[in-house]
């Protein structure tokens, strides 16, 4: 299945060169959110997405770089983030040189983690897309019970929004359409189930080591 093209960032100096020459900065590309053009020559990316319950325990998590290479480091990071954010009304936090946007839904906390230079609005668009896609998929409130019963679908949703850390989609309608298409493919469904089982194994291993 062909994936949508991720939003590229402009090359360094793309706008500055035009300004120095006396001309206007280049216009935003079609489909690119206004005001979100950063100067790093890379794609819009995130470091991690995770969902915790209201006790700070991991339910779903995917990390896209080696900032936290081990399960132990990831779990410590998640616990620290939860302790910092679970009792505040804000939707954004800065922690350990990273930008974190988050949302509370009943007994769940959803987090999207980006670099310190990543645009907050872009991170928030990923978080909103994830929440609205899960809400549509579950057809109920986004809460722990329903998430656990539909974990394979939750992994499919996340994989349509982010691939290898690169943001692919921020429209929940498009995400749901693609998830429904992939759900008809037995191989991909088995892959998502395998992700759930692997996540469960890692959590059990970590709990035994504590």
From Swiss-Prot:
Q: Which GO terms describe its cellular component?
A: cis-Golgi network; COPI vesicle coat; cytosol; endoplasmic reticulum membrane; endoplasmic reticulum-Golgi intermediate compartment membrane; Golgi membrane; transport vesicle
Q: Where is this region: Disordered?
A: 1-34
One BP term from GO: intra-Golgi vesicle-mediated transport
Protein transport recorded as keyword: yes
In what way does this protein cross or attach to the membrane? Peripheral membrane protein
KW Transport (keyword) present: yes
Record function comment? The coatomer is a cytosolic protein complex that binds to dilysine motifs and reversibly associates with Golgi non-clathrin-coated vesicles, which further mediate biosynthetic protein transport from the ER, via the Golgi up to the trans Golgi network. Coatomer complex is required for budding from Golgi membranes, and is essential for the retrograde Golgi-to-ER transport of dilysine-tagged proteins. The zeta subunit may be involved in regulating the coat assembly and, hence, the rate of biosynthetic protein transport due to its association-dissociation properties with the coatomer complex.
Similarity annotation: Belongs to the adaptor complexes small subunit family.
Protein name listed in UniProt:
Coatomer subunit zeta-2
**What species does this protein belong to?**
Homo sapiens
Specify the taxonomic lineage: Eukaryota, Metazoa, Chordata, Craniata, Vertebrata
- Gene of origin? COPZ2
